[in-house]
Amino acid sequence: MANIVKTAFANMGWMMISQIIASVCAFVWTIVTAWYLGPSDYGIFGAAVSFAALFGIIIDFGLPTYLVRSISTDFDNEHIYLDNSISLKLFLAVFYVIAVYLTSMALGWENKLVMMCLLIAIENVIKSYHALLFSSFQAHEKMKYQAITNTVLNVLTLLFIILITFTDLSLVGIAFAYIFANFIALIYEIFALRKHIIKPKLSFDFDFYRVLLKAGLPFALNGLFYTIYYSIDLVMITHFSTTYATGLYNSAYKLITVLTLFYTIYSSVVFPVMSKLFKNEKDLLKLSFVKSIKYLSLVTIPISVFTMFYGFDIIQIYGAEYIEAGGVLTVLIWTVCFLFVNGASSLILNASHNEYSVTKIYSIAAIFNICLNFVLIPNYSVYGAAVSTVLSEILILFLQFYMVSKINQLPDRHLVFDLLKICFASGLLGIVLYFLNLNMWVAMPVSIVVYFAVILLVKTIDQEDKLIIKQIMGR
Protein backbone atom coordinates (compact mmCIF):
# COMPACT_ATOMS: atom_id res chain seq x y z
CA MET A 1 0.00 0.00 0.00
CA ALA A 2 2.74 2.46 0.99
CA ASN A 3 4.72 1.89 -2.21
CA ILE A 4 1.61 2.26 -4.36
CA VAL A 5 0.69 5.55 -2.71
CA LYS A 6 4.25 6.93 -2.89
CA THR A 7 4.65 6.00 -6.56
CA ALA A 8 1.26 7.43 -7.47
CA PHE A 9 1.89 10.72 -5.73
CA ALA A 10 5.47 10.97 -6.96
CA ASN A 11 4.04 10.73 -10.46
CA MET A 12 1.37 13.22 -9.53
CA GLY A 13 4.10 15.54 -8.27
CA TRP A 14 5.73 15.57 -11.69
CA MET A 15 2.39 15.98 -13.39
CA MET A 16 1.34 18.71 -10.98
CA ILE A 17 4.43 20.78 -11.76
CA SER A 18 3.71 20.27 -15.44
CA GLN A 19 0.07 21.15 -14.90
CA ILE A 20 0.86 24.38 -13.09
CA ILE A 21 2.99 25.44 -16.04
CA ALA A 22 0.35 24.21 -18.49
CA SER A 23 -2.47 25.98 -16.67
CA VAL A 24 -0.58 29.26 -16.58
CA CYS A 25 0.33 28.97 -20.26
CA ALA A 26 -3.20 27.93 -21.28
CA PHE A 27 -4.68 30.71 -19.18
CA VAL A 28 -2.48 33.30 -20.88
CA TRP A 29 -2.88 32.05 -24.46
CA THR A 30 -6.65 31.70 -24.01
CA ILE A 31 -6.86 35.35 -23.02
CA VAL A 32 -4.45 36.46 -25.75
CA THR A 33 -6.30 34.45 -28.43
CA ALA A 34 -9.75 35.68 -27.38
CA TRP A 35 -8.54 39.27 -27.16
CA TYR A 36 -6.74 39.07 -30.52
CA LEU A 37 -9.53 37.38 -32.49
CA GLY A 38 -12.61 39.02 -30.97
CA PRO A 39 -15.88 37.14 -30.23
CA SER A 40 -16.81 36.33 -33.86
CA ASP A 41 -13.47 34.82 -35.00
CA TYR A 42 -13.03 33.24 -31.57
CA GLY A 43 -16.42 31.63 -32.17
CA ILE A 44 -15.19 30.24 -35.50
CA PHE A 45 -12.12 28.84 -33.75
CA GLY A 46 -14.24 27.23 -31.02
CA ALA A 47 -16.70 25.79 -33.54
CA ALA A 48 -13.84 24.26 -35.57
CA VAL A 49 -12.26 22.69 -32.48
CA SER A 50 -15.58 21.22 -31.35
CA PHE A 51 -16.55 20.01 -34.82
CA ALA A 52 -13.21 18.26 -35.38
CA ALA A 53 -13.50 16.68 -31.93
CA LEU A 54 -16.82 15.07 -32.87
CA PHE A 55 -14.93 12.83 -35.31
CA GLY A 56 -12.27 11.97 -32.72
CA ILE A 57 -13.45 8.37 -32.46
CA ILE A 58 -11.92 7.71 -35.88
CA ILE A 59 -8.38 8.73 -34.94
CA ASP A 60 -8.46 7.72 -31.26
CA PHE A 61 -10.57 4.55 -31.32
CA GLY A 62 -10.01 4.04 -27.59
CA LEU A 63 -6.47 2.78 -28.16
CA PRO A 64 -4.65 4.86 -25.48
CA THR A 65 -6.96 3.73 -22.66
CA TYR A 66 -6.85 0.12 -23.79
CA LEU A 67 -3.05 0.20 -24.07
CA VAL A 68 -2.63 1.59 -20.54
CA ARG A 69 -4.71 -1.23 -19.10
CA SER A 70 -3.08 -3.92 -21.24
CA ILE A 71 0.56 -2.85 -20.96
CA SER A 72 0.35 -2.19 -17.20
CA THR A 73 -0.58 -5.85 -16.68
CA ASP A 74 1.44 -7.40 -19.55
CA PHE A 75 4.81 -5.67 -20.06
CA ASP A 76 6.22 -8.60 -22.05
CA ASN A 77 3.94 -7.89 -25.00
CA GLU A 78 4.30 -4.11 -24.97
CA HIS A 79 5.98 -4.06 -28.39
CA ILE A 80 3.07 -5.90 -29.97
CA TYR A 81 0.51 -3.49 -28.53
CA LEU A 82 2.41 -0.27 -29.14
CA ASP A 83 4.01 -0.97 -32.53
CA ASN A 84 0.77 -2.07 -34.16
CA SER A 85 -1.18 0.80 -32.62
CA ILE A 86 1.28 3.31 -34.10
CA SER A 87 0.90 1.90 -37.61
CA LEU A 88 -2.86 1.48 -37.28
CA LYS A 89 -3.18 5.18 -36.51
CA LEU A 90 -1.64 6.04 -39.87
CA PHE A 91 -4.67 4.56 -41.62
CA LEU A 92 -7.10 6.02 -39.10
CA ALA A 93 -5.55 9.48 -39.54
CA VAL A 94 -6.26 9.53 -43.28
CA PHE A 95 -9.91 8.58 -42.76
CA TYR A 96 -10.24 11.13 -39.96
CA VAL A 97 -8.94 14.15 -41.91
CA ILE A 98 -11.03 13.27 -44.97
CA ALA A 99 -14.19 12.84 -42.85
CA VAL A 100 -13.76 16.21 -41.12
CA TYR A 101 -13.07 18.07 -44.36
CA LEU A 102 -15.86 16.53 -46.46
CA THR A 103 -18.49 16.86 -43.73
CA SER A 104 -17.67 20.52 -43.08
CA MET A 105 -17.94 21.14 -46.83
CA ALA A 106 -21.27 19.31 -47.01
CA LEU A 107 -22.72 21.53 -44.27
CA GLY A 108 -22.18 24.55 -46.49
CA TRP A 109 -20.06 26.44 -43.99
CA GLU A 110 -18.02 29.47 -45.02
CA ASN A 111 -14.52 28.81 -46.38
CA LYS A 112 -12.79 30.23 -43.30
CA LEU A 113 -14.58 27.78 -41.01
CA VAL A 114 -13.93 24.82 -43.34
CA MET A 115 -10.22 25.67 -43.49
CA MET A 116 -10.06 25.91 -39.69
CA CYS A 117 -11.74 22.51 -39.35
CA LEU A 118 -9.10 20.99 -41.64
CA LEU A 119 -6.18 22.55 -39.74
CA ILE A 120 -7.56 21.54 -36.35
CA ALA A 121 -8.01 18.00 -37.69
CA ILE A 122 -4.30 17.90 -38.61
CA GLU A 123 -3.43 19.11 -35.11
CA ASN A 124 -5.65 16.39 -33.61
CA VAL A 125 -3.78 13.71 -35.56
CA ILE A 126 -0.53 14.80 -33.91
CA LYS A 127 -2.24 14.99 -30.52
CA SER A 128 -3.55 11.46 -30.97
CA TYR A 129 0.03 10.20 -31.24
CA HIS A 130 0.85 12.08 -28.05
CA ALA A 131 -1.95 10.22 -26.27
CA LEU A 132 -0.85 6.88 -27.72
CA LEU A 133 2.77 7.20 -26.58
CA PHE A 134 1.68 8.58 -23.21
CA SER A 135 0.00 5.22 -22.59
CA SER A 136 3.45 3.62 -22.30
CA PHE A 137 4.65 6.22 -19.78
CA GLN A 138 1.46 5.77 -17.76
CA ALA A 139 1.61 1.97 -17.81
CA HIS A 140 5.20 2.06 -16.53
CA GLU A 141 4.23 4.81 -14.06
CA LYS A 142 7.02 7.04 -15.37
CA MET A 143 5.08 10.26 -15.60
CA LYS A 144 8.19 12.43 -15.48
CA TYR A 145 8.62 12.25 -19.25
CA GLN A 146 4.96 12.87 -19.96
CA ALA A 147 5.18 15.90 -17.69
CA ILE A 148 8.20 17.24 -19.57
CA THR A 149 6.46 16.66 -22.91
CA ASN A 150 3.40 18.56 -21.73
CA THR A 151 5.57 21.40 -20.48
CA VAL A 152 7.40 21.67 -23.81
CA LEU A 153 4.08 21.58 -25.66
CA ASN A 154 2.38 24.26 -23.60
CA VAL A 155 5.34 26.64 -23.45
CA LEU A 156 5.83 26.39 -27.22
CA THR A 157 2.11 26.90 -27.86
CA LEU A 158 2.14 30.08 -25.79
CA LEU A 159 5.26 31.42 -27.49
CA PHE A 160 3.93 30.66 -30.98
CA ILE A 161 0.54 32.25 -30.27
CA ILE A 162 2.18 35.41 -28.92
CA LEU A 163 4.36 35.47 -32.05
CA ILE A 164 1.26 35.12 -34.25
CA THR A 165 -0.47 38.05 -32.56
CA PHE A 166 2.57 40.30 -33.06
CA THR A 167 2.94 39.31 -36.73
CA ASP A 168 -0.84 39.56 -37.25
CA LEU A 169 -1.22 36.23 -39.06
CA SER A 170 -4.91 36.05 -38.09
CA LEU A 171 -7.04 32.98 -37.38
CA VAL A 172 -5.13 30.56 -39.63
CA GLY A 173 -1.88 31.56 -37.92
CA ILE A 174 -3.33 30.56 -34.54
CA ALA A 175 -4.11 27.09 -35.92
CA PHE A 176 -0.56 26.68 -37.23
CA ALA A 177 0.80 27.71 -33.82
CA TYR A 178 -0.95 24.68 -32.29
CA ILE A 179 0.24 22.37 -35.08
CA PHE A 180 3.92 23.34 -34.85
CA ALA A 181 3.96 23.20 -31.03
CA ASN A 182 2.42 19.71 -31.01
CA PHE A 183 4.82 18.45 -33.67
CA ILE A 184 7.95 19.64 -31.86
CA ALA A 185 6.72 18.21 -28.54
CA LEU A 186 6.02 14.88 -30.25
CA ILE A 187 9.63 14.70 -31.42
CA TYR A 188 10.82 15.06 -27.81
CA GLU A 189 8.28 12.48 -26.62
CA ILE A 190 9.53 9.89 -29.11
CA PHE A 191 13.12 10.56 -28.03
CA ALA A 192 12.25 10.15 -24.32
CA LEU A 193 10.28 6.96 -24.96
CA ARG A 194 13.11 5.39 -26.97
CA LYS A 195 15.73 6.31 -24.38
CA HIS A 196 13.94 5.41 -21.15
CA ILE A 197 11.28 2.77 -21.86
CA ILE A 198 10.96 1.18 -25.28
CA LYS A 199 12.01 1.75 -28.88
CA PRO A 200 8.75 1.71 -30.83
CA LYS A 201 8.66 0.75 -34.47
CA LEU A 202 6.09 0.21 -37.19
CA SER A 203 4.47 -3.22 -37.25
CA PHE A 204 1.71 -4.08 -39.72
CA ASP A 205 -0.08 -7.07 -38.22
CA PHE A 206 -3.55 -6.78 -39.76
CA ASP A 207 -4.90 -9.63 -37.65
CA PHE A 208 -3.84 -7.82 -34.50
CA TYR A 209 -5.44 -4.64 -35.86
CA ARG A 210 -8.78 -6.42 -35.46
CA VAL A 211 -7.91 -7.24 -31.86
CA LEU A 212 -7.03 -3.61 -31.14
CA LEU A 213 -10.12 -2.21 -32.84
CA LYS A 214 -12.44 -4.65 -31.11
CA ALA A 215 -10.91 -4.06 -27.68
CA GLY A 216 -10.71 -0.30 -28.14
CA LEU A 217 -14.26 0.09 -29.46
CA PRO A 218 -16.03 0.44 -26.07
CA PHE A 219 -13.47 3.03 -24.96
CA ALA A 220 -13.87 4.77 -28.33
CA LEU A 221 -17.66 4.88 -28.06
CA ASN A 222 -17.31 6.14 -24.52
CA GLY A 223 -15.05 8.92 -25.77
CA LEU A 224 -17.40 9.65 -28.68
CA PHE A 225 -20.47 10.14 -26.52
CA TYR A 226 -18.40 12.05 -23.98
CA THR A 227 -17.17 14.35 -26.75
CA ILE A 228 -20.64 14.79 -28.21
CA TYR A 229 -22.22 16.28 -25.13
CA TYR A 230 -19.15 18.42 -24.43
CA SER A 231 -18.62 19.60 -28.01
CA ILE A 232 -21.98 19.52 -29.73
CA ASP A 233 -23.17 22.62 -27.88
CA LEU A 234 -20.66 24.88 -29.66
CA VAL A 235 -21.56 23.38 -33.03
CA MET A 236 -25.28 23.78 -32.34
CA ILE A 237 -24.87 27.36 -31.10
CA THR A 238 -23.08 28.14 -34.35
CA HIS A 239 -25.95 26.54 -36.29
CA PHE A 240 -28.88 28.04 -34.36
CA SER A 241 -27.33 31.37 -33.41
CA THR A 242 -24.19 33.27 -34.47
CA THR A 243 -20.43 32.86 -34.29
CA TYR A 244 -20.51 35.83 -31.89
CA ALA A 245 -22.64 33.81 -29.45
CA THR A 246 -20.33 30.84 -29.99
CA GLY A 247 -17.38 33.06 -29.08
CA LEU A 248 -19.05 34.13 -25.83
CA TYR A 249 -19.80 30.53 -24.87
CA ASN A 250 -16.34 29.37 -25.88
CA SER A 251 -14.69 32.03 -23.70
CA ALA A 252 -16.47 30.67 -20.61
CA TYR A 253 -15.93 27.07 -21.66
CA LYS A 254 -12.18 27.57 -22.09
CA LEU A 255 -11.86 28.72 -18.49
CA ILE A 256 -13.64 25.54 -17.41
CA THR A 257 -11.23 23.54 -19.56
CA VAL A 258 -8.25 25.02 -17.72
CA LEU A 259 -9.71 23.74 -14.43
CA THR A 260 -10.47 20.29 -15.81
CA LEU A 261 -6.84 19.81 -16.81
CA PHE A 262 -6.20 18.90 -13.17
CA TYR A 263 -8.51 15.92 -13.56
CA THR A 264 -6.58 14.84 -16.66
CA ILE A 265 -3.46 14.59 -14.50
CA TYR A 266 -5.27 12.74 -11.74
CA SER A 267 -6.81 10.17 -14.09
CA SER A 268 -3.55 9.52 -15.95
CA VAL A 269 -1.86 8.69 -12.63
CA VAL A 270 -4.69 6.79 -10.94
CA PHE A 271 -6.05 4.67 -13.84
CA PRO A 272 -3.02 2.34 -14.22
CA VAL A 273 -2.93 1.98 -10.42
CA MET A 274 -6.63 1.06 -10.38
CA SER A 275 -6.10 -1.50 -13.16
CA LYS A 276 -3.41 -3.25 -11.10
CA LEU A 277 -5.51 -3.09 -7.92
CA PHE A 278 -8.48 -4.68 -9.69
CA LYS A 279 -6.24 -7.59 -10.64
CA ASN A 280 -4.56 -7.99 -7.24
CA GLU A 281 -6.18 -6.02 -4.38
CA LYS A 282 -9.86 -5.16 -4.80
CA ASP A 283 -10.17 -3.65 -1.30
CA LEU A 284 -7.55 -1.03 -2.17
CA LEU A 285 -9.38 -0.41 -5.45
CA LYS A 286 -12.44 0.72 -3.53
CA LEU A 287 -10.30 2.85 -1.22
CA SER A 288 -8.69 4.61 -4.18
CA PHE A 289 -12.15 5.28 -5.62
CA VAL A 290 -13.51 6.71 -2.38
CA LYS A 291 -10.49 8.91 -1.79
CA SER A 292 -10.59 10.10 -5.40
CA ILE A 293 -14.13 11.40 -4.97
CA LYS A 294 -13.31 12.98 -1.62
CA TYR A 295 -10.14 14.79 -2.68
CA LEU A 296 -11.54 15.96 -6.02
CA SER A 297 -14.70 17.29 -4.35
CA LEU A 298 -12.59 18.99 -1.70
CA VAL A 299 -11.13 21.19 -4.45
CA THR A 300 -13.93 21.62 -6.99
CA ILE A 301 -16.95 22.50 -4.85
CA PRO A 302 -15.47 25.64 -3.22
CA ILE A 303 -14.08 26.77 -6.60
CA SER A 304 -17.59 26.50 -8.04
CA VAL A 305 -19.07 28.51 -5.18
CA PHE A 306 -16.47 31.24 -5.59
CA THR A 307 -17.02 31.42 -9.36
CA MET A 308 -20.78 31.65 -8.87
CA PHE A 309 -20.23 34.95 -7.03
CA TYR A 310 -17.44 36.34 -9.20
CA GLY A 311 -18.16 34.94 -12.68
CA PHE A 312 -18.68 38.38 -14.24
CA ASP A 313 -15.45 39.66 -12.69
CA ILE A 314 -13.47 36.63 -13.87
CA ILE A 315 -14.73 36.80 -17.46
CA GLN A 316 -13.53 40.39 -17.81
CA ILE A 317 -9.98 39.12 -18.17
CA TYR A 318 -10.95 38.71 -21.84
CA GLY A 319 -12.02 42.33 -22.11
CA ALA A 320 -15.32 44.21 -22.09
CA GLU A 321 -16.46 42.50 -25.32
CA TYR A 322 -16.98 39.25 -23.41
CA ILE A 323 -18.89 40.55 -20.37
CA GLU A 324 -22.08 38.75 -21.47
CA ALA A 325 -20.28 35.42 -20.98
CA GLY A 326 -20.08 35.98 -17.21
CA GLY A 327 -23.53 34.52 -16.65
CA VAL A 328 -22.63 31.47 -18.72
CA LEU A 329 -19.54 30.90 -16.58
CA THR A 330 -21.55 30.96 -13.34
CA VAL A 331 -23.66 28.10 -14.70
CA LEU A 332 -20.96 26.07 -16.48
CA ILE A 333 -18.65 26.06 -13.45
CA TRP A 334 -20.88 23.46 -11.77
CA THR A 335 -20.00 20.96 -14.48
CA VAL A 336 -16.54 20.79 -12.91
CA CYS A 337 -17.89 19.29 -9.66
CA PHE A 338 -19.89 16.60 -11.41
CA LEU A 339 -17.24 15.96 -14.06
CA PHE A 340 -14.58 15.14 -11.47
CA VAL A 341 -16.82 12.76 -9.52
CA ASN A 342 -18.13 11.18 -12.73
CA GLY A 343 -14.56 10.86 -13.93
CA ALA A 344 -13.60 8.90 -10.83
CA SER A 345 -16.58 6.60 -11.41
CA SER A 346 -15.53 6.07 -15.03
CA LEU A 347 -12.02 5.17 -13.88
CA ILE A 348 -13.17 2.41 -11.55
CA LEU A 349 -15.61 1.02 -14.13
CA ASN A 350 -12.96 1.01 -16.87
CA ALA A 351 -10.33 -0.46 -14.55
CA SER A 352 -12.72 -3.26 -13.54
CA HIS A 353 -13.43 -4.17 -17.20
CA ASN A 354 -16.89 -2.57 -17.23
CA GLU A 355 -16.13 -0.16 -20.05
CA TYR A 356 -19.32 -1.12 -21.90
CA SER A 357 -21.32 0.22 -18.95
CA VAL A 358 -19.52 3.54 -19.25
CA THR A 359 -20.25 3.56 -22.98
CA LYS A 360 -23.97 3.01 -22.38
CA ILE A 361 -24.07 5.76 -19.77
CA TYR A 362 -22.38 8.32 -22.00
CA SER A 363 -24.56 7.34 -24.97
CA ILE A 364 -27.68 8.02 -22.90
CA ALA A 365 -26.20 11.30 -21.68
CA ALA A 366 -25.24 12.35 -25.22
CA ILE A 367 -28.76 11.75 -26.53
CA PHE A 368 -30.19 13.56 -23.50
CA ASN A 369 -27.82 16.48 -24.08
CA ILE A 370 -28.62 16.79 -27.78
CA CYS A 371 -32.38 16.74 -27.13
CA LEU A 372 -32.01 19.44 -24.47
CA ASN A 373 -29.87 21.54 -26.79
CA PHE A 374 -32.51 21.36 -29.52
CA VAL A 375 -35.05 22.73 -27.04
CA LEU A 376 -32.96 25.19 -25.03
CA ILE A 377 -30.44 26.72 -27.48
CA PRO A 378 -33.01 28.18 -29.94
CA ASN A 379 -34.84 29.79 -26.99
CA TYR A 380 -32.08 30.64 -24.51
CA SER A 381 -28.93 30.58 -26.68
CA VAL A 382 -25.72 30.19 -24.67
CA TYR A 383 -27.52 29.91 -21.33
CA GLY A 384 -29.57 27.01 -22.66
CA ALA A 385 -26.40 25.20 -23.72
CA ALA A 386 -24.84 25.73 -20.29
CA VAL A 387 -27.87 24.38 -18.43
CA SER A 388 -28.02 21.40 -20.79
CA THR A 389 -24.40 20.50 -20.01
CA VAL A 390 -24.92 20.68 -16.23
CA LEU A 391 -28.08 18.55 -16.36
CA SER A 392 -26.26 15.97 -18.48
CA GLU A 393 -23.53 15.68 -15.84
CA ILE A 394 -26.14 15.16 -13.11
CA LEU A 395 -27.73 12.38 -15.15
CA ILE A 396 -24.34 10.71 -15.56
CA LEU A 397 -23.75 10.94 -11.81
CA PHE A 398 -26.86 8.91 -11.00
CA LEU A 399 -26.30 6.36 -13.78
CA GLN A 400 -22.65 5.75 -12.90
CA PHE A 401 -23.29 5.34 -9.19
CA TYR A 402 -25.94 2.78 -10.07
CA MET A 403 -23.41 0.82 -12.14
CA VAL A 404 -20.72 1.14 -9.46
CA SER A 405 -23.16 -0.35 -6.94
CA LYS A 406 -23.59 -3.39 -9.21
CA ILE A 407 -19.87 -4.23 -8.92
CA ASN A 408 -20.00 -3.79 -5.13
CA GLN A 409 -17.71 -0.75 -5.13
CA LEU A 410 -20.27 1.84 -4.00
CA PRO A 411 -18.80 4.09 -1.27
CA ASP A 412 -20.17 3.69 2.24
CA ARG A 413 -21.76 6.29 4.52
CA HIS A 414 -18.36 7.70 5.58
CA LEU A 415 -17.89 9.28 2.16
CA VAL A 416 -21.42 10.72 2.35
CA PHE A 417 -20.55 12.36 5.66
CA ASP A 418 -17.30 13.72 4.20
CA LEU A 419 -19.14 15.19 1.21
CA LEU A 420 -21.70 16.77 3.53
CA LYS A 421 -18.85 18.39 5.47
CA ILE A 422 -17.33 19.71 2.23
CA CYS A 423 -20.72 21.08 1.13
CA PHE A 424 -21.22 22.66 4.56
CA ALA A 425 -17.82 24.39 4.39
CA SER A 426 -18.51 25.55 0.83
CA GLY A 427 -21.99 26.77 1.76
CA LEU A 428 -20.58 28.72 4.68
CA LEU A 429 -18.02 30.20 2.30
CA GLY A 430 -20.87 31.31 0.04
CA ILE A 431 -22.65 33.03 2.92
CA VAL A 432 -19.45 34.87 3.89
CA LEU A 433 -18.88 36.03 0.30
CA TYR A 434 -22.49 37.16 -0.01
CA PHE A 435 -22.48 39.34 3.09
CA LEU A 436 -18.93 40.71 2.82
CA ASN A 437 -19.32 41.58 -0.90
CA LEU A 438 -15.54 41.87 -1.30
CA ASN A 439 -13.44 42.77 -4.31
CA MET A 440 -12.56 39.56 -6.18
CA TRP A 441 -8.82 39.80 -5.48
CA VAL A 442 -9.44 40.35 -1.77
CA ALA A 443 -12.05 37.59 -1.71
CA MET A 444 -9.59 34.96 -2.99
CA PRO A 445 -7.32 34.76 0.09
CA VAL A 446 -10.29 35.29 2.40
CA SER A 447 -12.09 32.36 0.75
CA ILE A 448 -9.08 30.06 1.16
CA VAL A 449 -8.74 30.88 4.86
CA VAL A 450 -12.47 30.58 5.60
CA TYR A 451 -12.95 27.35 3.67
CA PHE A 452 -9.98 25.42 5.05
CA ALA A 453 -10.64 26.69 8.57
CA VAL A 454 -14.12 25.15 8.42
CA ILE A 455 -12.75 21.98 6.79
CA LEU A 456 -10.35 21.51 9.70
CA LEU A 457 -12.97 22.50 12.26
CA VAL A 458 -15.45 19.82 11.14
CA LYS A 459 -12.62 17.25 10.89
CA THR A 460 -13.00 16.44 7.21
CA ILE A 461 -9.40 15.16 7.13
CA ASP A 462 -9.54 11.87 9.05
CA GLN A 463 -6.83 9.50 10.30
CA GLU A 464 -6.82 7.56 7.04
CA ASP A 465 -6.12 10.77 5.12
CA LYS A 466 -3.32 11.67 7.52
CA LEU A 467 -1.79 8.21 7.04
CA ILE A 468 -1.86 8.67 3.25
CA ILE A 469 -0.21 12.08 3.63
CA LYS A 470 2.54 10.55 5.79
CA GLN A 471 3.14 7.81 3.22
CA ILE A 472 3.38 10.38 0.46
CA MET A 473 5.97 12.27 2.50
CA GLY A 474 7.88 9.03 3.13
CA ARG A 475 7.36 8.94 6.88
PLM feature segments, named:
Residues V114, L118, I148-K195, V211, ...:
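Hydrophobic alpha-helical transmembrane segments
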Residues I71-L88, L248-S363:
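Specific pore-lining/lateral-gate transmembrane helices of multi-pass inner-membrane transport
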Residues F27-D41, T165, L224-L259, P272, ...:
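Helix-terminus/linker motif at the lipid-water interface of multi-pass membrane proteins
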Residues C25-W29, G46-I71, N124-H130, G223-I232, ...:
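Small-residue-rich midsections of specific transmembrane alpha-helices
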Residues A365-F368, H414-K466:
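Transmembrane alpha-helical segments of multi-pass transport proteins
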Residues M1-C25, D76-H79, D83, F206-N222, ...:
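N-terminal membrane topogenesis motif
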Residues I4-P64, V97, Y101, N154, ...:
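Signature of the first transmembrane helix
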Residues M1-I4, A8, K144, L171-A175, ...:
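Interhelical loop/hinge segments that connect adjacent transmembrane helices in multipass membrane
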